[in-house]
A protein has these predicted regions:
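C-terminal regulatory/oligomerization modules of transcriptional regulators
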Residues: 1-10, 131-157
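N-terminal leader segment of winged-helix/HTH proteins
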Residues: 1-39
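Alpha-solenoid HEAT/Armadillo repeat architecture
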Residues: 10, 37, 53, 68, ...
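Short, locally clustered residues in the helix-turn-helix/winged-helix DNA-binding domain
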Residues: 22, 50-54, 115, 142
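A structural signal for well-ordered alpha-helices, especially hydrophobic packing surfaces
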Residues: 25, 111, 145-148
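N-terminal helix-turn-helix DNA-binding core of bacterial DNA-binding proteins
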Residues: 26, 30-73, 84
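Charged, amphipathic alpha-helical coiled-coil/dimerization segments
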Residues: 29, 79-139
């Protein structure tokens, strides 16, 4: 009896960088989601909230582009933030079809806490890094983000 063994070639990744970045992002976001639950912020909403606090008057399209998410995701998150009293939505003065998003006093109050926590996460991520290593990693990730941003805009259309 002859048994044939087929060789199965599995394609491998050229780099694990996206898996590492994804794991890092999910871990930090999971920690933050747990910590912000008491603030009545649901999964990932703190990301939208911080960008609105940092860019008062931003519209949904600009916010979606900034965060690299689709407009439906942004709309859903913003509706929840409005309902929770974190964001005000006002009709754009120049384009009556558009709306501008502004932080409320409530969101400005928690913004400081969110930034403190984000800085703490950054400190943990950079534990045992030299200042030069921190700068190099940051510059390289910014460069990678820019490369992906161009592709994201192409695919988004």
């Amino acid at each position: 009896m002859v048994v044939s063994v087929e060789v199965c070639l599995i394609k491998t990744l050229d780099s694990n960088i996206l898996r590492e970045v994804g794991t890092l992002s999910r871990a930090v976001n999971s920690i933050n989601d747990i910590k912000y639950k008491e603030l009545k912020l649901q999964k990932g909403q703190f990301t939208f909230l911080t960008r609105i606090c940092e860019n008062p008057g931003i519209n949904l399209v600009e916010l979606s582009n900034m965060l690299k998410v689709d407009k439906a995701t942004t709309t859903k998150a913003i509706q929840k933030l409005i309902k929770a009293g974190y964001v005000d939505k006002k009709q754009d003065k120049f384009d009556k079809r558009g709306y501008n998003l502004t932080p409320t006093d409530k969101s400005l109050g928690v913004y400081e806490l969110i930034i403190e926590e984000e800085n703490r996460s950054i400190e943990i991520c950079f534990d045992n890094f030299t200042d030069e290593e921190k700068q190099v990693v940051t510059k390289l990730l910014e460069k990678m983000s820019k490369n992906v941003e161009n592709e994201w805009f192409k695919v988004k259309r």
